[in-house]
């Protein structure tokens, strides 16, 4: 069994991380889609820290285990495949969006921002791009994003928290 161990999670690419930090440091009304994540207490705590540091409104998905505390003041409600009500309003009023391994991010963005309508910068943290080659097309749509960080949310959130703690001049690579 030792010969079949899982590889370590990839670190976020430096340029993508710097671009994400630049977007988030300027954001006044960020929004976080809290998607898939581990059951780790430290990952849970880091998601809360990120939302609080950014003062970002958050949502979770009905089909996933909780990705953010539903009693937290920054949580505005959970959603399924259709975005509506206060969740949709918060997404549309956001000036930056972070998708933490969200289910079908491409469809979520299309529902919130119809083709031709303006939308904020989107940071996608997910390894889902690996499945966007399947012949059956049952993976959902490829999300059109401004920054793609190909790793698991816990690794990227930790790096974002570290980067947001630094002065803006230290974030440039």
Language-model features, listed with the residues they occupy:
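Anionic-ligand anchoring segments at beta-strand to alpha-helix junctions in alpha/beta enzyme folds, i.e.
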Residues: 2-3, 10-13, 19-97
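Glycine-rich, acidic loop regions that bind phosphate or pyrophosphate groups
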Residues: 64-173
């Amino acid at each position: 069994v030792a010969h079949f161990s899982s590889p370590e999670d990839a670190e976020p690419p430096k340029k993508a991380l710097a671009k994400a930090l630049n977007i988030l440091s300027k954001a006044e009304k960020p929004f976080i889609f809290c998607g898939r994540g581990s059951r780790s207490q430290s990952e849970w705590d880091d998601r809360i820290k990120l939302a609080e540091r950014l003062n970002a409104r958050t949502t979770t998905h009905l089909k996933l285990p909780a990705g953010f505390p539903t009693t937290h003041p920054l949580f505005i409600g959970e959603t399924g495949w259709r975005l509506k009500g206060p969740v949709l309003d918060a997404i549309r009023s956001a000036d930056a969006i972070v998708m933490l391994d969200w289910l079908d991010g491409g469809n979520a963005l299309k529902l919130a921002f119809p083709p031709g309508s303006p939308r904020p910068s989107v940071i996608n943290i997910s390894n889902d791009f690996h499945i966007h080659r399947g012949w059956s097309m049952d993976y959902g749509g490829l999300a059109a994003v401004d920054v793609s960080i190909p790793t698991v949310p816990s690794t990227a959130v930790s790096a974002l928290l570290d980067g947001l703690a630094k002065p803006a001049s230290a974030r440039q690579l």
